[in-house]
Amino acid sequence: MAMPENWVRFAIEISDAQWEEEEIREFINLFQYQGFDAAVVLSRIFELAKKADLSRDQMLRDIRALITLHLTRGNKLSSIEKRLSEEGKKEFALLKARYQLVDKAKEAADLTLSRIAIANAGLTCRILPQVVAHTAVTRSRMESLSADYPVCMMHNAFAGLIDETLPEDSIKALVDAHRLYLLEFSRTINVKHRGMEAKEILDANDSALQAGLASSFLTPSQKRAYLLSFKLVDGNGKVNKAVQQAATVLRSLI
């Protein structure tokens, strides 16, 4: 390849070069799959539900079933199947096939149980109070660390509901209270984390937390509405006592 003699002409030649639309679509897919786009996940769920000729109510039931499955059984499909009743296995097989579930996402539209839960953060956090006796980290465990710990914080989906327009001290309190759960969850599911310092564990998981906090899928007002419905903040954006207490416990550990 010869060196261009005129860089302006070279730039024009680049812009005039032809390409197939499929090439750009492949690039989008190639460079997007590591990220997470809730709209893509929801669109895929809707597409597959429509393909299965489901009603809206049936689709919503499926989403609730998938989130409950994730919250109580985790994300690894093979492990989940081994621990289900025969009736549960039949329902699981149906959902797995219908929504083409995978353990690990390789493309933007791939559906994992955790992606479905995070894309539906508001619903996930609404379901939590009903299932926290059956989760990896239970309500009683979190309350042993901080009395009246807010159960709606007990999944990493919660980070996507923190309104970035709240007063700075409220944001920090919500984040730190949520981090107390993330810390306990990491220690529970990852044996090697049990001997690590709290700050090391939190630092290792910080990128996922920051991605949730940076999510713009919901508007600040929509996020605030969820926080108000969970009674985590008041009309002035001030956090409640349980949140403040959990944040204080976390800070004492680091």
Curated annotation (Swiss-Prot):
Which domain of life does this protein belong to? Viruses
Principal location: virion
Task: Provide GO CC annotations from the record.
Answer: helical viral capsid; host cell endoplasmic reticulum-Golgi intermediate compartment; host cell Golgi apparatus; host cell nucleus; ribonucleoprotein complex; viral nucleocapsid
- Keyword RNA-binding tagged: yes
User: Where, in this chain's numbering, is RNA bound?
Assistant: Y33, F36, K76, S114, R115, R194
Report the locations given in the UniProt record.
Answer: Virion; Host cytoplasm; Host nucleus; Host endoplasmic reticulum-Golgi intermediate compartment
Q: Which InterPro entries match?
A: Capsid_Phlebovir/Tenuivir (IPR009522), Nucleocapsid_Phlebovirus (IPR015971)
Enumerate the GO terms in the molecular function aspect.
RNA binding
* Signal peptide start-end: none
Task: Cite the entry's keywords alphabetically.
Answer: Capsid protein, Helical capsid protein, Host cytoplasm, Host Golgi apparatus, Host nucleus, Ribonucleoprotein, RNA-binding, Viral nucleoprotein, Virion
Give a single Pfam family match. Tenui_N
For domains, the record's comment is: The N-terminus is involved in homooligomerization.
Describe its assembly.
Answer: Homodimer. Homohexamer; ring-shaped, necessary to form the nucleocapsid. Homopentamers; opened pentamers in solution. Binds to viral genomic RNA. Interacts with glycoprotein Gn; this interaction allows packaging of nucleocapsids into virions.
Please explain the role this protein plays, according to its UniProt record.
Encapsidates the genomic RNA, protecting it from nucleases. Displays high affinity for single-stranded nucleic acid. The encapsidated genomic RNA is termed the nucleocapsid (NC) or ribonucleoprotein. The ribonucleoprotein has a non-helical structure. Serves as template for viral transcription and replication. After replication, the nucleocapsid is recruited to the host Golgi apparatus by glycoprotein Gn for packaging into virus particles.
Membership in a protein family: Belongs to the phlebovirus nucleocapsid protein family.
- What's the name of the protein? Nucleoprotein
Species annotation: Uukuniemi virus (strain S23)
Taxonomic placement: Viruses, Riboviria, Orthornavirae, Negarnaviricota, Polyploviricotina
